[in-house]
Curated annotation (Swiss-Prot):
The gene is HHO. This is Histone H1. GO terms for molecular function: DNA binding. The keyword DNA-binding applies. The modification Phosphothreonine is found at residues 48, 54, 117. Keywords: Chromosome, DNA-binding, Nucleus, Phosphoprotein. Its main location: nucleus. Cell-growth/division-associated phosphorylation by a CDC2-like kinase. Is additionally phosphorylated on either Ser-33, Thr-34 or Thr-35, and on either Thr-39 or Ser-40.
Length: 165
């Protein structure tokens, strides 16, 4: 009885070690997958503001955001130069660089997320619709010049398609 329990205890301990090890490996994998993306985002320094500005596509909002984005770009450029030097120096400084990149990314996201995401979503929805409407109307006009009767059918198809989109 004592031998069977001791064996089962050792087996349980081995199983625990086996289960803990892949969890640690999974955590390392997730950190590896996220941190190089963030370091690569911070390294070009142009990608981080572009990702914030590209969905906007509004000139008025770019004017409002360029002030904050220029500040973030200047901060990102500072970290880029630091990170470029850190890559030459040692691997031990990379985690500090990653933390700095996270600190730079998150305040911009926090500042951008609350007021900007709602505005972004509104303009994301409206602007592609306008583009699609222009795309739909121009071929309809061409069809109208070619054939007036099928053009009416095409306009109905275009409106249905735009509603689906």
């Amino acid at each position: 009885g004592k031998q069977s329990t001791s064996k089962s205890v050792t087996r349980e301990k081995k199983d625990v070690k086996k289960t803990v090890a892949p969890k640690k490996a999974i955590k390392k994998v997730t950190k590896k997958s996220t941190t190089p993306v963030k370091t690569s985002k911070a390294a070009p320094a142009s990608t981080t503001p572009i990702k914030d500005t590209t969905p906007v596509k509004a000139d008025a909002k770019k004017i409002h955001r360029t002030k904050t984005m220029k500040e973030s770009v200047s901060d990102a450029k500072k970290t880029v130069h630091k990170s470029a030097g850190d890559k030459k120096l040692s691997r031990s400084q990379k985690p500090a660089k990653r933390e700095a990149a996270k600190k730079i990314v998150h305040p911009a996201k926090k500042a951008a997320a609350k007021p900007k995401t709602a505005k972004k979503e509104v303009k994301k929805d409206t602007k592609p619709v306008k583009k699609d409407a222009k795309k739909d109307t121009k071929p309809v006009k061409k069809d109208a010049k070619k054939d007036t009767k099928p053009a009416k059918k095409d306009t109905k198809k275009a409106t249905k398609g735009s509603k689906k989109n």
